[in-house]
Amino acid sequence: MAIKLNHTIVHSTDPDAAAHFFAGLFGLPAPKSFGPFLDVEVGNEVTLAFLSAGGMEVQVQHYAFLVSDQEFDEIFARVQKRKLKYWADPGMKQEGEINKHYGGRGVYFQDLSGHLLEIITRPYGAWGKW
């Protein structure tokens, strides 16, 4: 059996706002409440479970999403409409740029708790696969 990611917890300063921000930005269905979590289903049977950091400092994480060219255009348009800062690199040095790694496009931006979100149209290391 192949191992698949099923869900991960995304600690947030305001999980309700963070889950709705994420779902809206990515064009996904509204979050569903499940116990203390606000779940956003991202596809491929994977769920992001937004949870309050409980007053503790949120440890910033990186979440990368492989999207189609059309999805990239749609998500990136929402990033721009919301006037979010974006970068071509995870070090946030190339502001306002899009990377072109492996013949695709990629961009990084932050969510409401500071997590670094990334959308890419080609998986890294994808030469010869696309």
Predicted regions and their residues:
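Conserved catalytic-core motifs of GNAT/GCN5-like acyltransferases
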Residues: 29-34, 91, 121-124
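N-terminal beta-strand motif that seeds the catalytic metal site of vicinal oxygen chelate
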Residues: 1-16, 63, 122-130
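Conserved beta-strand in the GNAT
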Residues: 48-51, 108, 117-120
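Vicinal oxygen chelate
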Residues: 65-112, 116, 124-130
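Short, charged/polar surface micro-motifs in flexible loops or helix N-caps
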Residues: 44-47, 56-57, 68-73
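Short aromatic/hydrophobic contact patches that present stacked aromatics
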Residues: 7-9, 39, 62-64, 106-108
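Short glycine-enriched loop/turn motifs at secondary-structure junctions
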Residues: 2-4, 56-60, 100-101
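Core segments of cupin and vicinal oxygen chelate
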Residues: 2, 9-48, 52-54
